[in-house]
Amino acid sequence: MLVRFSVENFLSFKNLTEFSMVAGKMTRHSGHIAVCNHKRLLKGAFIFGANASGKTNLIRAISFARNIVLNGIERTNCDKKFFRIDEDCKDNPGVFQFDIFSQGHFYSYGFAISYAAAVEEEWLYQIDNPNKEFCVFLRSKQENDETFTISSDIQFKDGRQEARFSVYKDDISSSKMKQTLFLRDIAMRSPEDSPEYQPFR
């Protein structure tokens, strides 16, 4: 279930723009509210606005980011998707973030990509506790390098799982994987979809 979507430097969105399904304080239409782990979320929403105000581009942004998660950057057209009114934006990454509710937990997943079709950064946090985020993984590109560093708060109890995760980390840290999202790579290797990946299907 989508809780929030954020986008920056994509088509008509230069600055960070957010679409939220978190319910406001009004309680007039309580039947339109779903309560998930004590958080009130809208069951549905409409997008209103004047012509050429960005409604279609918001849908395009969600579709573009979802396509990258499901099919990979190499199968996604990234040409001229940056905010073209400002030429400086050509060299800035496009940023996409999904906050989702899946299998009883809240997650925040996002990535930043260059429009040369390469991952700059990628992150996945479990955000059940508003005061403390749990880092499932944070993938950051090294300065002046094409390789990545991976950090995580996961404490493995099973040595086999830790070894498996270590192999994933080593593989995705390579410069050869700069067009591959870590979340997609894990999902493709796993027999079952992870709860963080399922909402994108």
Please state what every model-predicted region is.
Residues 34, 38-46, 50, 59-117:
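Conserved P-loop NTP-binding catalytic core
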Residues 12-14, 40, 91, 130, ...:
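A generic structural signal for short, non-catalytic loop/turn and secondary-structure boundary residues
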Residues 7, 98-104, 124-128:
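Short acidic, glycine-rich loop/turn motifs
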Residues 27, 72, 131:
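Short aromatic-acidic-glycine turn motif
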Residues 108-201:
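Electropositive, glycine-dotted interaction segments
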